[in-house]
């Protein structure tokens, strides 16, 4: 299927005149000395790491360890929390997305997010995909039709819904709703997908479909997933970061994290001694 170009969607790079770092060739994100506070409480402590392009990076750790706060910082969702403040840098292909002159709306198109609980709009399946596109100015039906099919196909949902596109999205199963939410995000043509426990509320069969989908999507997107399911992290991710009490304890290839971790705290968590 031909790629659809949407000139109405300006990119972050088009909006900000900052030269990218040379290091951005192999890494799509570089985090430097990141601290995140809620009021006086520091939730993320001086984290530095690089995220590979076209890979799945898993963030693991016990509840309250800072992994979801860290994930939300990557497309500035924490800006929506009045008490939150951030210091340090998050460089997306060389651009510091924490700069005040970054267009946050455009940033969230390029770095899309899917949440734990499926949240389809109370609209038709078709309208769920096209809603943001129309808001951005795309009105051509032929273009919208193509994006709907392309996005639902990438989310492994097209064959299940192609004959019911104008039915309510709320009529779908939980697993189908979550894949619809992924398709809705893909319709905006992001570079990065942020997934906050996308399968935790689903049954085992739907969970397996989401995992299979994530592995396939990394060919085209860079994916960061928060998960409490360590088996899931070991199955689908290329790199794993272990967070504890706001600190990044260890970050390495997933195989090494699970088979031969360097830190005792990582080993204890992997082996279920706490968490």
Curated annotation (Swiss-Prot):
Reaction equations catalysed: phosphate(out) + ATP + H2O = ADP + 2 phosphate(in) + H(+)
Lineage, highest ranks first: Bacteria, Bacillati, Bacillota, Bacilli, Bacillales
Localisation per UniProt entry: Cell membrane
Broad EC category: translocase
Predominant subcellular localization, coarse grouping: membrane
Chain positions recorded as ATP binding sites: 61-68
Enzyme Commission code(s) on record: 7.3.2.1
Taxonomic source organism: Bacillus licheniformis (strain ATCC 14580 / DSM 13 / JCM 2505 / CCUG 7422 / NBRC 12200 / NCIMB 9375 / NCTC 10341 / NRRL NRS-1264 / Gibson 46)
Xref: SMART domains: AAA
A Pfam family it matches: ABC_tran
GO cellular component, one term: plasma membrane
Protein name: Phosphate import ATP-binding protein PstB 2
Family annotation (InterPro entries): AAA+_ATPase (IPR003593), ABC_transporter-like_ATP-bd (IPR003439), ABC_transporter-like_CS (IPR017871), P-loop_NTPase (IPR027417), PstB-like (IPR005670)
Key words of the record: ATP-binding, Cell membrane, Membrane, Nucleotide-binding, Phosphate transport, Translocase, Transport
Function: Part of the ABC transporter complex PstSACB involved in phosphate import. Responsible for energy coupling to the transport system.
Gene, per the UniProt record: pstB2
Domain ABC transporter, residue spans: 29-270
Keyword presence, Phosphoprotein: no
Superkingdom of the source species: Bacteria
GO molecular function, one term: ATP binding
Family to which this protein belongs: Belongs to the ABC transporter superfamily. Phosphate importer (TC 3.A.1.7) family.
GO biological process: phosphate ion transmembrane transport
Subunit structure and binding partners: The complex is composed of two ATP-binding proteins (PstB), two transmembrane proteins (PstC and PstA) and a solute-binding protein (PstS).
